[in-house]
Amino acid sequence: MQAFIRAHGIILPMNQDHVDTDAIIPQRWLVTVERDGLADGFMGAWRYDEHGQPRPECVLNQPAYQGAAIVLARENYGCGSSREHAVWAHQGYGIRAIVAASYGPIFHENCLKNGLLPITLPAADVATLMAQALADPGCACEVDLVSQRVIGPDGRAYPFEIDAGRRQLLLEGVDDIDLALARAADIAAFQRRQQQDQPWLA
C-alpha cells in the first residue's frame, strides 16, 4: 500500500448528499476483482450518457477538474452496498483523499484499509470549502496527515481527527495483510501452543 504523508491537488466537488457506491462505481464495472482498470467507471453513470458519450455538465468531464486529487463531498458519502471497487475506482482515477461531512461506515472503513484517506470535517467547514471550489473551478487544497490539517484554497487550515492506529498505518503504507505477515512468527507460535493445549480444536 502506498504511504500517505500529504497530498496537494485540484478539488473535485461532489455537491450533493448521499452519493452512494452504485453512483461511484456502477454495477457493470464490477466484473473484475482486480484493483486496476476502474478509472473509466468512476462515477460512470454520471460521466456518460446511454450511448457512452461524456456528459458535458458532469464536473468530471469539465477541463478545470482534470487531474483532480481530492474529492470534496457533503453528507453520507459512499453510502449503500459494500464494494471495495468504490475505493479502487477513486484511486484509479487519481484521487488520494476525500473530504466530507460524513460517510457510509463500510465505505469509510474500506478507504482506510486501502490507503485512501477519508477526512471528516464539520458540515459548516465543508460548505465553506464547497463554496470556494464552485466559485473557482480548478482550485486546489492540501491534505496533511502528519499535522492532521486540510489547507483550503485560501490558506485557511481545518484540523481533522483520525484514529491514531489507522493514521500510523497510512503514514507507513502498511495494510492489514502487511500487518499479519509482520506477525507471522507470533501467529505460528500461537497456533503451536493452541494445538498443544487444546488438541481437540485441531
UniProtKB/Swiss-Prot annotation:
Q: What pathway, per the record?
A: Amino-acid biosynthesis; L-leucine biosynthesis; L-leucine from 3-methyl-2-oxobutanoate: step 2/4
On the tree of life, the source organism's domain of life is: Bacteria
The Gene Ontology CC terms held by the record are: 3-isopropylmalate dehydratase complex
Q: Which reaction does it catalyse?
A: (2R,3S)-3-isopropylmalate = (2S)-2-isopropylmalate
Q: Which GO terms describe its molecular function?
A: 3-isopropylmalate dehydratase activity
Q: Which UniProt keywords are listed? A: Amino-acid biosynthesis, Branched-chain amino acid biosynthesis, Leucine biosynthesis, Lyase
Positions of disulphide bridges: none
Which InterPro entries does the entry link to?
A: 3-IsopropMal_deHydase_ssu, Aconitase/3IPM_dehydase_swvl, AconitaseA/IPMdHydase_ssu_swvl, IPMI_Swivel, LeuD
Gene3D superfamilies referenced in this protein's UniProt entry, alphabetically: Aconitase, domain 4
Entry keyword Amino-acid biosynthesis: yes
One Pfam short name: Aconitase_C
Q: Does the keyword NADP apply?
A: no
Q: What is its EC number?
A: 4.2.1.33
Q: Name one GO biological process term.
A: L-leucine biosynthetic process
Subunit composition and interactions: Heterodimer of LeuC and LeuD.
Family per similarity comment: Belongs to the LeuD family. LeuD type 1 subfamily.
Briefly state the protein's biological role: Catalyzes the isomerization between 2-isopropylmalate and 3-isopropylmalate, via the formation of 2-isopropylmaleate.
According to UniProt, the name of this protein is: 3-isopropylmalate dehydratase small subunit 2
